[in-house]
């Protein structure tokens, strides 16, 4: 297994890690079996989140006796100091540890980020927890390229997590900038949320980029572990047939795939268009139907509120048929009721 340093954190991590979303689909014993296999194979980076229902709890159970073999990262969507303090304590309890290596601000909007950094914001809780030795380092996870650019200039940001894959490469320049600033870059969504069926090709594409510190595909079984490790350790340049397949994937998938750049905003009806498509992806491709449906239903406005004005489509740099895509998402969730 190849290891690298996670930017200025100085943490020594494997180039491939565990993305914790699929843990929600298995049980504690399967999670324990998975983590012991990862430890045997030298995979030492685990990412989870407060928002991934039982993921933290199952990982905590599975880490008993082997916690020291892993670099553990989690994240919270809390934006205030009080709420973040509570979430840090819950994470410590769930994960059955007295120390979390990396705690991240989870997917803030521009407005959320202002709140996080304001007086009484979540950053205060994170910095106090770091000073107290409860967490080691502070990072941020994002889906907006504009916020990625902003995060690069924030002195407290030690790591940045952002989607990067065959069809989502809008953050490439900022990923390179992470190296310049010694910020660890964590690649999420390497399989585009399950939209890319050839996992080996998807991971080989990501690992061609020398500025990626670690890639965190979701894994839930032994086959996926060995397949992903083999792909990440394959250092050959992409071959002609692989490059041809990548172009074909971009041509086919790119016309119906939301990159979550948010240039379509603001929607005239207040719909979070990228949010709708994100939940639709979890529903269809991760097979997390109830989890995705509950989050979709909790949105103040969702796909059913679309009036078909088309303003979003005039702004989309990828010329996506957003109105048609929203109708499909609306039907997907309506049929689940």
Locate each region found by the language model.
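Short hydrophobic/aromatic-enriched beta-strand-loop microsegments
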Residues: 69-72, 157-165, 236-242
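Conserved residues at the C-terminal ends of beta-strands
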Residues: 19, 49, 103-106, 141, ...
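N-terminal binding-site loop/beta-alpha segment at the start of enzyme catalytic domains
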Residues: 1-70
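Short catalytic-loop micro-motif centered on adjacent basic/acidic residues
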Residues: 44-49, 73-74, 136-139, 159-163, ...
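Structured C-terminal cap/extension of enzyme domains
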Residues: 39-44, 173-187, 191-337
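Conserved, mostly hydrophobic/aromatic
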Residues: 6, 18, 46, 59, ...
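Alpha-helix-loop-beta-strand connector modules within alpha/beta enzyme cores
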Residues: 56-75, 123-132, 182
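Glycine/proline-rich, positively charged
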Residues: 29, 40, 79-186, 191-194
């Amino acid at each position: 297994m190849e290891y690298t340093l996670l930017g200025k954190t100085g943490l020594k991590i494997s180039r491939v890690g565990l993305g914790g979303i699929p843990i929600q689909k298995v049980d504690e014993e399967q999670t324990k079996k998975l983590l012991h296999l990862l430890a045997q194979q030298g995979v030492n980076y685990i990412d989870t989140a407060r928002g991934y229902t039982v993921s933290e709890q199952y990982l905590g159970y599975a880490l008993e006796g082997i916690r020291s073999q892993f670099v553990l990262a989690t994240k919270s969507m809390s934006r205030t100091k009080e709420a973040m303090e509570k979430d840090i304590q819950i994470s410590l309890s769930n994960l059955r540890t007295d120390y979390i290596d990396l705690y991240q601000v989870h997917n803030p909007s521009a407005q959320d980020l202002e709140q996080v950094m304001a007086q009484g914001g979540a950053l205060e809780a994170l910095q106090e927890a770091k000073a107290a030795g409860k967490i080691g380092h502070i990072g941020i996870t994002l889906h907006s390229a504009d916020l990625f650019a902003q995060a690069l200039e924030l002195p407290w940001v030690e790591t940045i997590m952002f989607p990067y894959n065959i069809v989502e490469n809008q953050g490439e320049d900022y990923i390179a900038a992470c190296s310049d600033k010694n910020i660890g870059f964590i690649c999420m969504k390497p399989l585009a949320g399950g939209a890319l069926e050839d996992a080996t090709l998807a991971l080989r594409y990501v690992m061609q980029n020398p500025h990626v510190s670690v890639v965190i595909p979701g894994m839930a079984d032994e086959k996926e572990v060995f397949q992903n490790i083999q792909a990440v350790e394959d250092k050959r340049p992409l071959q002609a047939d692989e490059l041809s397949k990548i172009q074909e994937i971009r041509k086919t998938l790119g016309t119906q795939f939301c990159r979550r750049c948010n240039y379509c905003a603001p929607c005239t009806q207040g719909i979070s268009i990228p949010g709708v498509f994100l939940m639709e992806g979890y529903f269809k491709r991760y097979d997390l139907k109830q989890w995705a449906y509950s989050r979709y239903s909790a949105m103040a406005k969702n796909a059913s509120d679309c009036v078909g004005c088309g303003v979003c489509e005039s702004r989309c740099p990828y010329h996506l048929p957003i109105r048609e895509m929203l109708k499909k998402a609306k039907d997907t969730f309506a049929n689940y009721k």
